[in-house]
Amino acid sequence: MKIKALSKLKPEEGIWMTEVEKPEMGHNDILIRIKKTAICGTDVHIYNWDEWSQKTIPVPMVVGHEYVGEVVGIGQEVRGFEIGDRVSGEGHITCGHCRNCRGGRTHLCRNTTGVGVNRTGAFSEFLVIPAFNAFKIPAGISDDLASIFDPFGNAVHTALSFDLVGEDVLITGAGPIGIMAAAVAKHVGARHVVITDVNEFRLDLARKMGVTRAVNVMNEKLEDVMSDLGMTEGFDVGLEMSGNPSAFNSMLTNMNHGGKISLLGIPPSDMAVDWNQVIFKGLVIKGIYGREMFETWYKMASLIQSGLDLTPIITHHYKIDDFQAGFDMMRSGMSGKVILDWE
């Protein structure tokens, strides 16, 4: 049976609507009928066919890894799922036999493959994943929100890596993940949450999500903002989401002694770092990859159930046949999350 899917067909800019064979299920898998997908920054990299994509993405391949759908098939060894369950899923498929997997640190598996990155993705009418990777969506959480659980998980993992209660938090990079991380920090009890960027549309989005200050570093100095807020000692926690060298070095300059930094943004390989700031301030820097399985997923659902409102981050919806308009919107930088509807 042929199904519709968005694929990377050629090693050049673009993504194409194609027909592919319906995926087949193994004993430990589930088959998901896709309802909604969201476009990730990674999908934009793949669309643009940048240096990272050229090294990473096999062609041709169905792409996409942010989704919600309904279980329509269950492998014979699978327990705990029923036909009709609403699910999203962890996009990192892990090996199960390395030291970290066997030690319960699955997100650090050295043999990880990625849905829509180096194995068949979710921009399709149907997706097969190991049942281990599926996450049931609690009642009361909308399909729209469930479809962005993957990037929301990046935000939660980054934000909750350090204690935030009563702390002053600096977030560099107001993309969707940075904005969601800011909302999480506020929700769990941080004092001042300051986010920086140069994109005024996204800074406005961050203001809607409740940050203390959204700072356009083209027109405003971070030091002046800290002074306005009565901060005399620097930020306690930094969340670096941009991969921008000047943003990271500005973060180092403005951290308090003993401050802690989570790094999610991917910098250029030749980024210069003022290590004196790190050493003499006694800073702790932690690299963040993916989501903790499945602690981050439980936290994500619980945060929404306890009143965290992420709805402003979803700014655009398109029918799947209008996928090109969705990608154009994401590439423009004038959007939050963009959702493609498959039904």
Swiss-Prot record:
Presence of keyword NAD: yes
Obligatory cofactor(s): Zn(2+)
Location of the active site: T42, H45
Cofactor, how bound (note): Binds 2 Zn(2+) ions per subunit.
InterPro entries the record matches: ADH-like_C, ADH-like_N, ADH_Zn_CS, GroES-like_sf, L-Threonine_3-DHase, NAD(P)-bd_dom_sf, PKS_ER, Zn_alcohol_dh
Main location: cytoplasm
Binding residues annotated for Zn(2+) 1, in chain numbering: C40, H65, E66
EC number: 1.1.1.103
A single Gene Ontology CC term: cytoplasm
GO molecular function: L-threonine 3-dehydrogenase activity; zinc ion binding
Keywords: Cytoplasm, Metal-binding, NAD, Oxidoreductase, Zinc
Keyword Cytoplasm: yes
Pfam families: ADH_N, ADH_zinc_N
GO biological process, one term: L-threonine catabolic process to glycine
Pathway it works in: Amino-acid degradation; L-threonine degradation via oxydo-reductase pathway; glycine from L-threonine: step 1/2
Matches recorded under PROSITE patterns: ADH_ZINC
Lineage top rank: taxon: Bacteria
Intracellular or extracellular location(s): Cytoplasm
Site feature Important for catalytic activity for the proton relay mechanism but does not participate directly in the coordination of zinc atom, where: D150
Chain positions recorded as NAD(+) binding sites: I177, D197, R202, L264, G265, I266, I288, Y289
Function: Catalyzes the NAD(+)-dependent oxidation of L-threonine to 2-amino-3-ketobutyrate.
Assembly with partners or alone: Homotetramer.
PANTHER family with a match to the protein in the record: L-THREONINE 3-DEHYDROGENASE (PTHR43401:SF2)
Family membership noted in the UniProt record: Belongs to the zinc-containing alcohol dehydrogenase family.
Name listed for the protein in its UniProt record: L-threonine 3-dehydrogenase
